From Swiss-Prot:
One of its GO terms (biological process) is tRNA 5'-leader removal. The keyword Isomerase does not apply. RNA-free RNase P that catalyzes the removal of the 5'-leader sequence from pre-tRNA to produce the mature 5'-terminus. One of its GO terms (molecular function) is ribonuclease P activity. This is RNA-free ribonuclease P. InterPro entries: RNA_free_RNase_P (IPR014856). PANTHER family: RNA-FREE RIBONUCLEASE P, UPF0278 PROTEIN TK1425. Belongs to the HARP family. The keyword Nuclease applies. It catalyses: Endonucleolytic cleavage of RNA, removing 5'-extranucleotides from tRNA precursor. It comes from the Archaea. Its EC number is 3.1.26.5. Keywords: Endonuclease, Hydrolase, Nuclease, tRNA processing. It comes from Archaeoglobus fulgidus (strain ATCC 49558 / DSM 4304 / JCM 9628 / NBRC 100126 / VC-16).
Amino acid sequence: MRQRFVLDTTAITDAGLRIKEGYESLCESAAEVLDLIALARLKLDISCYIPYPSVYTELTSFLKRYGCDEEIFTKLDTWLVKKTPNRYEVKIPAAIFYEYIITVRQKMNRGRRLAEEYILESSAITAKLEDKSKIEEEIGALISKFRDKYRAVMRQGILDSAPDLDVLLLAKELEAGVVSSDAGIRKWSERLGLRFVEAAKFPRMLKEYLKLMGSKDIVGWFESEED
């Protein structure tokens, strides 16, 4: 059966992928991953999709911020299939929707309790300090700490953006695998019965497929990369 994969932004930009493969920069890792995707398309008929315009816009904006060459954007437009998920036809089981609502509700309650704790802590700080600049310094540090904890509580394990949801909808529509390093996407991919591939493992998986083909041009390409 022909293999298809739907990529989110982290499939190209994941920091863990760069460390694991030894890439020096985001632009270098993006170029190499896109080259692998191109070879997989030409030699193995493996297609990699990206939800359009949501994830595509997110990814291109990310690459532009890092000053990547125009060649990378050309590769992206050539080898990633841009497709908008059919949001009106893709069917999601009611049990999944029900579970998601419960998860969000639980996180809202945890976020509220966390906010209450920090409000009480800030009140204690202002009560014992008189110097305005010192109060601002202490409260500023407390707010920064609260933001980090609140983000961890609210975002971990849920779909917190439209692009995240588009990845799952498109994968469901195409019966494709999902490539990402996002914990929320992973969790709900598993709930939907979708194949999930860690972003950091995706390049090596493609290399293994290609090496088993035994084509001289493919083997030579890998040898030149290692040199």
